[in-house]
Amino acid sequence: MSSTVNNGATGMPAPPDAANGFPQPGASSGSWPRAEEELRAAEPGLVKRAHREILDHERKRRVELKCMELQEMMEEQGYSEEEIRQKVGTFRQMLMEKEGVLTREDRPGAHIVAETPRRMEGLEPGLEYPPFDEDDGPVDCDCPVSCYRGHRGYRTKHWSSSSASPPPKKKKKKKGSHRRSRKKRRLESECSCGSASPLRKKKKNVKKHRRDRSDSGSRRKRRYRSRSLKSKRKEKNKERKRPHTESPGRRFHHHSSASSHSPSMSSHYSDSGSPSRLSPKHRDDGRKTGSQRSSGSRSPSPSGGSGWGSPQQNGGSRQRSGAHGGRPGSAHSPPDKPSSPRACDKAAAAPTPPARGKDSQSPRSAPSSQGRGGRAAGGTARRRRRRRRRRRSRSSANAPRRRGRRRTKPAPPRGSSRSLSGAHSSSDSGGGAPGPGPEPCSERGHGGHGKRAKERPPRARPASTSPSPGTRGRRGGPEGNSSSRSPGPHQGSWSSSRSPSKSHSRSPDKRTRSPSLSPSPKKPLGRDKDSEGRARHAEAEAARTRRRSRSYSPIRKRRRDSPSFMEPRRITSARKRPIPYYRPSPSSSSSCLSTDYSSRSHSRSPSPGHSHGSYSSRSHGTRSRSCSASRSRSPSYHSRSSSESGGF
């Protein structure tokens, strides 16, 4: 028995399949095949009809659109609704006749509709209502023709508006139709002539909602879009108006560097401080150093940013930069070097410098770009950029804080600037702990300056914090000489901020440990930058450091030496983030070392923030390498900063 059934089943479709999914209750088993055949015969007709219907539908939709337009126009001109309805109705009919749209014949037979309601619905939602002619009311709606017409118009309108391929005209009307639909809805509810069977009504409402939703959704979207543009524009203007034009810089930075945030901040500072001033000056030598520095600073911006602003402001616009770069020292000292590191950056920045000329915005950006250019090492730059990006995100959180701080700070006059710078730096560096950082820093910064002179002592003094400062100071010393002041503070500040981290990180251990460190920085700086630039006392140390570092071919070697640096690229990316977080030693140390020499570890390790400073300083010297390295490491976090700093 079962086999027969099965055979039968294989031969014949299961009843539900036979009629398009609609079981045919009275059918005997014999009727199945027949039903199927009938269906097959009907199919071509169905297909054709659908095709024609689609075409007609397009035409109808066009008609409805025109009617809608007319209605809208009339509404605007204040005609009464009755008049509007009448006119629209006649207009619609006229158009229909003209377009050759069939009203009645084109609709498939009722039985087909019954059989395949789904299909019909999909093809022609507009056809749900029975056809109607102007004269006789709607076939199955007992409300007056005008009322029905309103429904139908609405329905079609509504359908067309949500249809997939709306004619272009539709957009214009969206608002009107939206309004209208609301009105219509109201009307419909008022005209409680059960104009539509409950089912139909439900459908209508659903559709209506859908339309409204999509309508308003798209409208909303559009609105947002424009709003954002507008707001963007507004922001831009505001920023332009801002004193330092920080924002522009900021903005630029963003784009320009990943760290936009920070950078920009820094940038701001840098630039902002003396945008115009900077422009020219910076542009020239500033560009060299400043920009380098700036760049550097920029990066740091977040961290050093504050400092910079001031420094920048400081008359040493360049200095500022330097400070920024802060790794002022580096900026100055390393002008050459920075150049290189910066060079890369600069390359990027190069354009900016001119921009800088532009002043506010540009300046900022210039520095940043410069910084970037300065970055000199492409890889470094790349790394830095990466870091920056990271930093940016990270800093975004701090940035505001930082930025605010920075902003204020910059305010300080140049004179104070420096110290500010220091403070800033520190704050920046401190980044994380901006509040405190800065102060100490500043203090340190001052000290740094003094120290700078002292260079060494500070170094020693750095002790914990001092190391950094020391380092920085130290570094600053060497560098400081040139930039000395700024750097000093910067350094100092950094350090200080760093110091915490620093210690461990601070190269102290790594480098030469603290003492060494102290020397180290100096040395590195000297070594790197100083050496070149300074030759200075640092030289011996530098040599030592160099030896230590292995080759101070700056970037490369250093990097090579430090395990961390060994695979800079990987490290940077992978390690970047963590380290900062984990500011501690490892990276620090490695960083340190890399940096340390220069700025020394302190920077690096220190905390990222510190790192910044530090290497910023150092980096400067070594900056690029260091930076990178540093950057890579802790820097990441700060690195970014740092990186930037250095990098830039």
From Swiss-Prot:
Compositional bias annotation for Low complexity: 257-276, 289-317, 414-428, 461-471, 493-502, 579-648
Annotated segments matching region Disordered: 1-44, 99-139, 154-648
Biased composition (Basic residues): 168-186, 199-211, 219-243, 381-409, 545-560
Cellular compartments per GO CC: nucleus
Gene3D superfamilies recorded: 6.10.140.420
InterPro entries cross-referenced by the UniProt entry: mRNA_splic_Cwf21_dom (IPR013170), SRRM3_cwf21 (IPR047489), SRRM_C (IPR029360), SRRM_Domain-Containing (IPR052109)
SMART domains reported for this sequence: cwf21
Basic and acidic residues: compositionally biased ranges: 99-109, 525-544
Assigned protein family: Belongs to the CWC21 family.
Function: May play a role in regulating breast cancer cell invasiveness. May be involved in RYBP-mediated breast cancer progression.
Name under which the protein is recorded: Serine/arginine repetitive matrix protein 3
Organism per entry: Mus musculus
Source organism phylogeny: Eukaryota, Metazoa, Chordata, Craniata, Vertebrata
